Amino acid sequence: MASLKDLRDRIASVKATQKITKAMQMVAAAKLHRAQEAVEAGRSYTQRMDALVTNISKDVDLVDAPLLMRGTGNDHVHLLVVCTAERGLCGAFNTQIARLAREHIQKLHAAGKTVKILTVGKKGADILLRDFKSLMIDHVDLRSVKKIGFAEAAKISKQLIDLFNEGAFDVCTLFYSRFVSVITQRPMALSLIPAGQNPVDEGQDFVDQAKSREVSQSAVYEYEPDVASLLNDLIPRHISVQIFQALLENVAGEMGAKMSAMDNASRNAGEMINKLTVTYNRQRQAQITTELIEIIAGAEAL
């Protein structure tokens, strides 16, 4: 049985931990509000960009389409871009994304495909390194970036396009977590290259793309100088926008998951403090009772 001193020390330790988890919860809540605003603002732009590319691509012959759109004609080498958080303490957020990527890798291997992995975020890299170290070709470290901006997405996009032009892969798929609510984040797999493809997994990429495409379906476009030249400029930006939106979704999802995790941790700490306090009071009461009995017994002996 723990001594009273041990119980006091343990109660103090749990209270200190609870203060930390509550502070982290408040910080995550503040960051979540800003991240959620960025996600909602970005979704509209991403929707329209996707609809624009989809509709313009209908007016160009496949042979005249940019290589990023028509692809290599093969699907043997797959590059998986797995985006996770740089830090932990956010529940199963990182694990869920890595699990979806792992399932996709297993399916590709079963189909005889070659798989390469590029990770964005330390936690996802740590998880996948355990089983797929030989498949890793690069890692993007964003720990020094205080606020995710379009510049970070553009750098990743340029790296992917350069690799594609060098013939490093045929198909590129982006893994991230779509922000649904504070307690719900949905792992997604989105086809990046060839551009204009459908999502790899069930559901829609970002927000109901079918609806956004339908809205712009009846639009009539005139192109200057020509549709192929326009797509050559538009497709790289489209890829950058998709990556940027995925990063924004990840930030919001991470903050939501962290807020929930820290709230649960604070509640658990509170329950533990109550239990330890009850145990401490009982032991203290028993000790006082024993001391009184000893004093009374000594007085009677006199």
Curated annotation (Swiss-Prot):
UniProt-listed InterPro entries: ATP_synth_F1_ATPase_gsu (IPR035968), ATP_synth_F1_gsu (IPR000131), ATP_synth_F1_gsu_CS (IPR023632)
- How is the protein disposed in the membrane? Peripheral membrane protein
| One GO BP | proton motive force-driven plasma membrane ATP synthesis
Do the record's keywords include Transport? yes
Where in or outside the cell it occurs: the entry states:
Cell inner membrane
A GO MF annotation of the entry reads:
ATP binding
Q: Which UniProt keywords apply?
A: ATP synthesis, Cell inner membrane, Cell membrane, CF(1), Hydrogen ion transport, Ion transport, Membrane, Transport
Which Gene Ontology cellular component terms are annotated? plasma membrane; proton-transporting ATP synthase complex
Which family does this protein fall into?
A: Belongs to the ATPase gamma chain family.
What is the role of this chain?
Produces ATP from ADP in the presence of a proton gradient across the membrane. The gamma chain is believed to be important in regulating ATPase activity and the flow of protons through the CF(0) complex.
The record's section on PANTHER family has: ATP SYNTHASE GAMMA CHAIN (PTHR11693), ATP SYNTHASE SUBUNIT GAMMA, MITOCHONDRIAL (PTHR11693:SF22)
Q: Describe its partners and assembly state.
A: F-type ATPases have 2 components, CF(1) - the catalytic core - and CF(0) - the membrane proton channel. CF(1) has five subunits: alpha(3), beta(3), gamma(1), delta(1), epsilon(1). CF(0) has three main subunits: a, b and c.
Q: What is this protein called?
A: ATP synthase gamma chain
